[in-house]
Amino acid sequence: MPFCWILYLCKMKNIDYIAITDHDNIAGAIAFREYCKRKKASLNVIIGEEIMTVDGEIIGLYMTRDIPGGLTASETIGLLKEQGAVIYIPHPYDIRRKKTVLKESIICEYVDDIHCIECWNGRNSHISYGLQQEKIAQKYNIKSVVGADAHTFWEFGKNVMYFPKEPVNANAFINGLDEAIMSKGKIRNIVHFITKIDRLLKIMISGDFNEVRRIIIKKINNRKFRVSKNNR
């Protein structure tokens, strides 16, 4: 999404802080922060990253340097601790994204290092996902957060948190979680379809038609498998 849209939507929705958590890099977050500075915007940008470990996804907030994907959860958590980042577990339960969900055994093992865990993700495709996510947070007594996971313009401002004091740094964020108010938006499954179309268009524009062909064939084969399975 263009930076100008993100900034405009944050102004329209009265968002004071936004965490940018691109996959496996902080370059986008840093670039957006610099863009906001050039525009002399009052929006505060939290530098973050959604890191794909071999054990599932972990988010870091208030980061100062990249952490590559493909490491173990242990290595990733260690690197996040070195830079004083908030260690945040996204969507701890999600059938649609089960390949990216951090293993519960890892949550159990590193419970003392994890600062917060989502009890609701803005891209949940069913209400039951949120209930399961909340159960996991309660089971391990980890502070709960709401994750916007916004990729499209109408997702902005639907899932937000209101802090008693400004989360100016990692410590302020962690200390404010107990009194933070969570606002959960409605489920909108159409956003998943829009994201897939957007991704396909970007690949087509780049000229990588072999990748387009691979995605279409995979989709057709998956549908055939589901039909075959249902007909048994």
Give the residues covered by each predicted segment:
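Charged catalytic cores and adjacent phosphate/nucleic-acid-binding surfaces used
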Residues: 1-9, 27-38, 47, 51-69, ...
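Histidine-centered divalent metal-coordination motifs
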Residues: 23, 91, 151
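Divalent metal-dependent hydrolysis catalytic cores, especially in the metallo-beta-lactamase
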Residues: 6-27, 85-88
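Short glycine/serine/threonine/alanine-rich loop segments
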Residues: 15, 41-43, 85, 142
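General beta-strand structural signal in soluble alpha/beta enzymes
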Residues: 19, 45-47, 88-90, 144-146
